[in-house]
């Protein structure tokens, strides 16, 4: 009886061990993909090659590290494209006006292009405009510095001390340039009073009120038939053209601004 009980217990033990046991093949040719079905992941990595483990770790690190910066770069590129599109649309709105300005006045067009890059223009528009107006008088001041350095230095000193220069620099510079004509007009008054009076005609109120009468008066003064001697008429016209030669040597810009005298010769 005892032997039967022991035999039953042995059979039960074998049955229980057979249901809970699993086989690990020592020399199996099965691929590594089948192993995780029977073993946990940590145990399955122990049976892989070291090169395979390093490759999997590298792929995992690359996926975790590079995924977030790629998304950020894509977002930055989209934002940059959006800003570039808005800037292009704004620039296209001003292209017709800038094209017309380029045709009419190329210098003003270039200044308009440099307006955004000038810190003075962004900080103080009034000071920038005053600076642009002062640059219009720089050629005349440069010529004055070459012809007469003492007068140029004196003018620079007066520019810093005069209240008119501080309040309205272009008007002050224009006034100073007009004062340069006074010595030539004085010499003309001594040499030829008639030509001197004719030189003052552009400042006459008759030119402002009635241009036709002013032109008729100029033609009467310049008509050589009214002078009895043609040589005297030619001499007077030559005397009238003399101040313009002096103006062209001293200041070419002012010589272009002066009225043309001696139209009968030309």
Swiss-Prot record:
Pfam families: Zein. Zeins are major seed storage proteins. It comes from Zea mays (Maize). GO terms for molecular function: nutrient reservoir activity. The alpha zeins of 19 kDa and 22 kDa account for 70% of the total zein fraction. They are encoded by a large multigene family. Structurally, 22K and 19K zeins are composed of nine adjacent, topologically antiparallel helices clustered within a distorted cylinder. Belongs to the zein family. This is 22 kDa alpha-zein 8. Coiled coil: none annotated. Keywords: Seed storage protein, Signal, Storage protein. Residues 1-21 form the signal peptide. InterPro entries: Seed_Storage_Prolamin, Zein.
């Amino acid at each position: 009886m005892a032997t039967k009980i022991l035999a039953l217990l042995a059979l039960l033990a074998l049955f229980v061990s057979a249901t809970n046991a699993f086989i690990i093949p020592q020399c199996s040719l099965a691929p590594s993909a089948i192993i995780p079905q029977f073993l946990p992941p940590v145990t399955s990595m122990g049976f892989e090659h070291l090169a395979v483990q390093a490759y999997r770790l590298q792929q995992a690190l690359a996926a975790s590290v590079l995924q977030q910066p790629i998304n950020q770069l894509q977002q930055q590129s989209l934002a940059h494209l959006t800003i570039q599109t808005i800037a292009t649309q704004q620039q296209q709105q001003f292209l017709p006006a800038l094209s017309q300005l380029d045709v009419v006045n190329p210098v003003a067009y270039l200044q308009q292009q440099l307006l955004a890059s000038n810190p003075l223009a962004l900080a103080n528009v009034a000071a920038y405009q005053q600076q642009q107006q002062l640059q219009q008088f720089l050629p005349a001041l440069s010529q004055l510095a070459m012809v007469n350095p003492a007068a140029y230095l004196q003018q620079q000193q007066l520019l810093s001390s005069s209240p008119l220069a501080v309040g309205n620099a272009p008007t002050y510079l224009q006034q100073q340039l007009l004062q340069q004509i006074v010595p030539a007009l004085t010499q003309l008054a001594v040499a030829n009073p008639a030509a001197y009076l004719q030189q003052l005609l552009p400042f006459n109120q008759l030119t402002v009120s009635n241009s036709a009468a002013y032109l008729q008066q100029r033609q009467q003064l310049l008509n050589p038939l009214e002078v009895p001697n043609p040589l005297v008429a030619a001499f007077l016209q030559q005397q009238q053209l003399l101040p313009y030669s002096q103006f062209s040597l001293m200041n070419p810009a002012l010589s272009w601004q002066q009225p043309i005298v001696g139209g009968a010769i030309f």
